């Protein structure tokens, strides 16, 4: 029998939670009963998300932090009593043709999408394994990857590199954290109707090319991704680890 997702008494941390997918995931986890910790660089955005979560009678703590600031993130984790779920979501993209990629853009994407993702996952894992009954209660880490962690795409070589790296990290982490009953998976969305994608879609030619590459013929919605994340966070996914949940409308099936 299918059980309704219940994350009561679980503490979930979501990075990049000020808008887009992070915001959607934070609200969905709170609606499922989790105590949610939201992190973003922009305090006004966090305050808006906090209000939305409290409207659902959910529990929420907010911290303004750039996840590339390792020491600041470590200090935040010291203030948290326990952690059961991590949604490692913070990331960005700066599309450029490979031959014209600016050094500063490449370094920025590697710093955020790879190094910060690694550091956040490591620091949170260290916190999670310290819980005495961790093996009994389990834990879940969800790395927000992309369909472009599985296939290439024009003008996205650096983004490809960072997301392929995150896919590899997900599998390595899954093997090493399994003994603590901490599951590690990634969610790989196609283009999702977020503020960032809406900006890209101002280019009508690009939007047409994207839709032609999605067999279902439509971009994903934020709710499609937050539902996948909530599923992986819950007991319903107890035997799922070291894999990727594709939310890509069939893009990578071709």
Can you say where each PLM-predicted feature lies in the sequence?
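Short C-terminal tail/terminal secondary-structure segment
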Residues: 2-3, 151, 230, 241-254
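Conserved glycine-rich cofactor-binding loop
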Residues: 11, 18-20
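Substrate-binding pocket helix/loop in short-chain dehydrogenase/reductase
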Residues: 97-98, 102-110, 210
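Active-site loop immediately N-terminal to the catalytic Tyr-X3-Lys motif
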Residues: 99, 151-157, 179-180, 217, ...
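Active-site helix of classical SDR
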Residues: 121, 162, 170
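Residue(s) in the substrate-gating loop at a strand-loop-helix junction
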Residues: 146
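Short, small/polar-rich loop/turn modules that mediate ligand/substrate recognition or access, typified
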Residues: 178, 183, 240-242
């Amino acid at each position: 029998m299918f059980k309704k997702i219940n994350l009561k008494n679980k503490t979930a941390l979501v990075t990049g939670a000020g808008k887009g997918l992070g915001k959607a995931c934070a609200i969905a986890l709170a609606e499922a009963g989790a105590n949610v910790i939201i992190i973003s660089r922009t305090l006004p955005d966090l305050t808006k998300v906090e209000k939305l979560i409290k409207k659902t009678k959910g529990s929420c703590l907010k911290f303004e932090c750039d996840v590339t600031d390792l020491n600041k993130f470590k200090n935040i984790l010291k203030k948290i009593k326990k952690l059961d779920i991590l949604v490692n979501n913070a990331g960005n993209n700066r599309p450029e043709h490979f031959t014209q990629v600016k050094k500063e853009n490449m370094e920025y994407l590697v710093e955020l999408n790879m190094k910060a993702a690694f550091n956040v996952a490591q620091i949170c894992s260290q916190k999670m394994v310290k819980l005495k009954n961790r093996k009994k209660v389990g834990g879940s880490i969800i790395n927000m990857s992309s369909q472009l962690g599985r296939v290439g795409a024009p003008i996205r070589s650096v983004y490809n590199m960072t997301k392929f790296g995150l896919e590899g990290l997900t599998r390595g982490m899954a093997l090493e954290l399994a003994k603590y009953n901490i599951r590690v998976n990634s969610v790989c969305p196609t283009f999702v109707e977020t503020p960032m994608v809406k900006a890209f879609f101002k280019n009508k030619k690009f939007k047409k090319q994207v839709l032609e590459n999605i067999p279902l013929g439509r971009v994903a919605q934020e709710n499609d991704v937050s539902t996948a994340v909530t599923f992986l966070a819950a007991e319903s996914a107890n035997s799922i680890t070291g894999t990727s949940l594709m939310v890509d409308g069939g893009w990578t099936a071709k």
